[in-house]
């Protein structure tokens, strides 16, 4: 499978051009990561007639330009995903879906609501603005946080390898060490970048959604789990489906590539009919 490298505006993205593709999918990676970590899934998925794109979020991977890694906001992330999604739609003429992995599900949902280019969203994460996991109000919307941010600004950093146990998140011992060997991963977020997820209001909250959403979760996901997934799915209006992958871990694209690809493929083609 051929992997192309694209730069659109300031967004770096990989493209896996599937032969005779009948739809496209734009992937949003999770916390600390970049678009290239899903090579195996993307190549396999593209081989089944999908035009697959996997972008680096702003402040991640190679979408850093004149900024340090970890400096971004969810507003920027959503804008970049929408711009690239519209570019994909215009240049390919294909229906476009957006897929969010873990933290990337927040950006994916918000992008889905910010543009009509996306036919639907596959969300493999649940810390989504307007969901029960990201309530309003919350401490990041407080006057106290604004005072702290005004005082310290970009000097306050969140250590991601302390915040997340990647061995548990990825489902195997050694995952954290392996991630640290990849120079494109990001190990610190500016606290204001992380806070932006809790301060953001999507164009349409989950409770008023009208677009197709496919929630997916591993049966043994230690980060969210089926109960959390059901809680968020139940709080979402509109055409929503929830899929629990048997014996699945958190990173379904990485640890259950073939079987999970089949599930995503079937749902997307059903929506595109």
Where are these regions (language model features)?
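Conserved hydrolase catalytic core segment
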Residues: 99-123, 128-129
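Catalytic histidine-centered segment of alpha/beta-hydrolase-like enzymes
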Residues: 248-261
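Flexible "cap/lid" loop of the alpha/beta hydrolase fold
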Residues: 121-150
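Conserved alpha/beta-hydrolase "acid-adjacent" motif
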Residues: 222-228
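Active-site glycine-rich loops that stabilize anionic/oxyanionic intermediates
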Residues: 30-33
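Alpha/beta-hydrolase active-site loop
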Residues: 71-89
């Amino acid at each position: 499978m051929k992997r192309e490298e694209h730069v659109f505006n300031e967004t770096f993205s990989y493209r896996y051009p599937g032969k005779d593709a009948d739809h496209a999918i734009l992937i949003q990676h999770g916390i600390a990561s970049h678009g290239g970590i899903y090579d195996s899934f993307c190549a396999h998925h593209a081989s089944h007639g999908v035009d697959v794109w996997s972008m680096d979020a702003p402040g991640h991977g190679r979408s850093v330009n004149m900024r340090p890694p970890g400096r971004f906001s969810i507003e920027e992330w959503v804008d970049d995903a929408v711009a690239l999604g519209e570019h994909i739609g215009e240049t390919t003429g294909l229906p476009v879906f957006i897929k969010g992995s873990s933290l990337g599900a927040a950006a994916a949902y918000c992008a889905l609501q910010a543009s009509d280019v996306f036919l639907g969203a596959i969300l493999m994460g649940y810390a989504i603005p307007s969901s029960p996991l990201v309530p309003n109000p919350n401490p990041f919307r407080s006057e106290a946080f604004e005072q702290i941010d005004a005082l310290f600004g970009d000097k306050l950093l969140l250590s991601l390898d302390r915040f997340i146990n990647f061995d548990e998140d990825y489902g195997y011992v050694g995952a954290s060490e392996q991630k640290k060997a990849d120079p494109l991963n990001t190990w610190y977020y500016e606290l204001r970048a992380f806070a932006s997820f809790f301060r953001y209001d999507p164009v349409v909250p989950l409770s008023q959604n009208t677009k197709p959403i496919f929630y997916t979760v591993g049966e043994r996901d230690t980060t969210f789990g089926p109960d959390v997934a059901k809680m968020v799915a139940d709080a979402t209006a509109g055409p929503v489906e929830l899929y629990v992958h048997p014996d699945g871990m958190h990173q379904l694209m990485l640890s259950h590539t073939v079987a999970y690809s089949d599930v995503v493929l079937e749902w997307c083609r059903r929506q595109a009919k």
